[in-house]
Amino acid sequence: MRYNFVAIEGTMGAGKTTLSTKISQDFNGKLILEEFEPDKNPFLAKFYENPDKYAFQVEMTFLALRFQQLKDKLGNLDLFHDFIISDYYVAKSLIFSRENLQPDEYDLFSRFFNIIFSNIPKPELMVYLYLDVDHLQYNIRKRGRDYEQKIEDSYLEHLQQGYFDFIKQQSDMRILILDTNNIDFVANRKDYVRVVEAINQPYDVGIHRLVL
């Protein structure tokens, strides 16, 4: 793989974990998967039932989990020689918290974030998997996590916009936006190969868009 550290991003249902796992297996990469299970973040299911009450708790718990995981994983790897692929980029904490928290809570949260993650390496390439909301909802229903089944279209749309707003502000990263609405890289090997080939192209720092 051309890049030593790749982060796959997107909203829930975009296929981040599946793609990251397949690439790590095919390229003998070190895989970092986000820890989101209810036993890791006990506030997650409660948040989907009562967002206003549990938003701050769920975001702070994710912040701590992501920091500890990346600190442990990246600290034991050689970023110049190992190939590392993750199914998230830490900035998703800011994107989700901006959507979920009140303004005063977000201000406090972002201060914590900037302190904690100031020394965590950025990926050489961030890949954003774009799917329209209908595709996302289909995938969410298909995988059947109980706490995700009540997610509304508007919430996914706001998260998508949050990602786009974040991406526009990044001037020092390679970011690849892949529109995967017309392919199925999970079920179709040829589509998966097309995704890998797109990721493995040489990109300058900046934003790049491809429709597959």
Locations of regions flagged by a protein language model:
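Glycine-rich phosphate-binding loop used to anchor ATP phosphates in small-molecule kinases
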Residues: Y54, V58-P121
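A glycine- and Lys/Arg-enriched "phosphate-lid" helix/loop adjacent to the NTP-binding pocket
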Residues: S93-Q161
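Post-Walker A alpha-helix
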Residues: L19-S20, S24
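P-loop (Walker A) phosphate-binding loop of NTP-binding proteins
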Residues: T11
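NTP-dependent small-molecule kinase module
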Residues: R141-K150, S154-L212
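Hydrophobic anchor at the beta1->P-loop junction of P-loop NTPases
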Residues: I8
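Conserved substrate/cofactor phosphate-moiety recognition/catalytic segment
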Residues: Q25-L65
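Conserved lysine of the Walker
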Residues: K16
